């Protein structure tokens, strides 16, 4: 893990955020805390889920969590950053180039064409757990894992009440509190 790369990531997001909305965080300190430190803390100790895996970050936007995970777990086989906004994809391509991230691509296309393609999917702010699971189910390989980053368990409780609970097994839930902000990492594994 190279701290200089995380600092470079923060600088690039900060500068690009002046021109178009990548994040609501307006200072380098806030970007570092919320887009880097939180991801490093939430995923600490979970490298085994990423080694030699094909990973997708749905709704990647500013590159967190995907790029942060690629910097943290350099043995990710391939990282695909997916977003529906061309401007954000252009930024992500520039970001991956400036950070010298190999086997990392940013795409702006219908994600449905990627059936059974990913071992791991990450989602932070894209949508509800149920909606992201709907998208992710056909994208994941057999026994693939999806990581949801949320601020409460409300959406997980709704997921538990839904028919989707038969499609995914809960691997774990990890809680993290930082600066009066609560985050939850929910890991679900596809049932086949």
Curated annotation (Swiss-Prot):
It comes from the Bacteria. S-adenosyl-L-methionine binds at residues 59, 111-112, 124. The keyword Nucleotidyltransferase does not apply. Its EC number is 2.1.1.-. Its main location: cytoplasm. InterPro entries: rRNA_ssu_MeTfrase_G (IPR003682), SAM-dependent_MTases_sf (IPR029063). GO terms for cellular component: cytosol. It is found in: Cytoplasm. GO terms for molecular function: rRNA (guanine-N7-)-methyltransferase activity. Belongs to the methyltransferase superfamily. RNA methyltransferase RsmG family. Specifically methylates the N7 position of a guanine in 16S rRNA. This is Ribosomal RNA small subunit methyltransferase G. It comes from Mycoplasma genitalium (strain ATCC 33530 / DSM 19775 / NCTC 10195 / G37) (Mycoplasmoides genitalium).
